[in-house]
Amino acid sequence: MKRTVIMMLDSFGVGAAGDAAKFGDLGSDTFGHIAKACAEGKADIGREGPLTLPNLARLGLAHAAMESTGAFAPGFADDVELIGAYGHAQELSSGKDTPSGHWEMAGVPVLFDWGYFSEHQNSFPKELTDKILARAGLDGFLGNCHASGTTILEELGEEHMRSGKPIFYTSADSVFQIACHEGTFGLENLYRLCEIAREELEPYNIGRVIARPFDGTGPSDFARTGNRKDYSLEPPAKTVLDKLKAAGGEVVSVGKIADIYAYCGITKKVKANGLEALFDATLDEVKSAGENTIVFTNFVDFDSHYGHRRDVAGYAKGLEYFDSRLPEMLALLDEDDLLILTADHGCDPTWQGTDHTREYVPVLAYGAGLKAGSLGRRNSFADIGQSIASYFKLEPMEYGESFI
């Protein structure tokens, strides 16, 4: 039986990419810097000691990172019995954003330039916001700036609740984000507002509109809920997900995968929030998956909770939890199944600012007759999509080189 499981550790980079300097990210290293902080006792909040990832290490994580950076991360060495094939991949796409990374790993790199709102204050054109407000029947909005999603709630959440005005903000990514309180503004009202924004943003070539619902009574307890929703553009070409679906296969989205691909190539969506629930849902879907199925999970917490918030200890704790669950996944796989662990970009929690970092991503592959050992440096994330196409005997993708 042929099945593929893709476990996408959102933002888990393994060292500055070859073109990182162009992005201001030379020297970034999500995995390496987390390991260093742990080894130095600087990540002992909620956990303690060196970063411990025995199962990821057996799959080749430390070796992939070593080939990327030239040295083993602190606390890791060439002393494990490898069971997986490992490599690291350079992004071909023009950005370091979520859609670009996901689309490229499915065989469709983003070779055009996204639109961005580059001004840190007064970020959005008045013509755009006027159209959104008019269609939504609103008399104003808050924000209009680059911001951290948690900080802006502390600053504007109460005013939003009093006024009913939505909070519009952006970042270095190609994104338009709208934060609204679930109780006072309403979740469905937020979703409708995002749909309007998605339509009005068409001429601006913005990659995503993101609904950022939150709850709480004030700055001390405002918190995002699990009802985030991404409104992405459709990929510019057919991904390997589309091709498997067209061939009669199944593509199961766990978490926000369906949103990122604008539901293209998806046959089933499973909602789950948090590392534990996402892992549980992934296991459940693998247990019931039949022939010619992809189960594709985005573990978003690594990015949203730890990377962007520059929470080194939280990131380390999350990785160790994820690692502790991997034996459950390995036990479910048949000999012919293919397991791939990778990332879509970096988000070094020790780096300046709050944005993504341009990094190589790990490519860890297990099963399907693959021999343990190095896959080397891959020239594109699209090698993953091409390998999946080869595995399922689908029509080859335009980009990427198969390692199967």
UniProtKB/Swiss-Prot annotation:
CDD domains (UniProt xref): PPM
Top-level class of the enzyme under EC nomenclature: isomerase
UniProt remark on cofactor binding: Binds 2 manganese ions.
Catalysed reactions, as listed in the record: 2-deoxy-alpha-D-ribose 1-phosphate = 2-deoxy-D-ribose 5-phosphate; alpha-D-ribose 1-phosphate = D-ribose 5-phosphate
Entry annotated with the keyword Lipid biosynthesis: no
InterPro entries (UniProt xref): Alkaline_phosphatase_core_sf, DeoB, Metalloenzyme, Phosphopentomutase_DeoB_cap_sf
Keyword Transmembrane helix (UniProt): no
Binding site for Mn(2+) 2: 303, 308, 356
GO BP terms in the entry: 2-deoxyribose 1-phosphate catabolic process; 5-phosphoribose 1-diphosphate biosynthetic process; metabolic compound salvage; nucleotide metabolic process
Superkingdom of the organism of origin: Bacteria
Pfam short name (any one): Metalloenzyme
Family: Belongs to the phosphopentomutase family.
Functional description taken from the UniProt entry: Isomerase that catalyzes the conversion of deoxy-ribose 1-phosphate (dRib-1-P) and ribose 1-phosphate (Rib-1-P) to deoxy-ribose 5-phosphate (dRib-5-P) and ribose 5-phosphate (Rib-5-P), respectively.
Protein's UniProt name: Phosphopentomutase
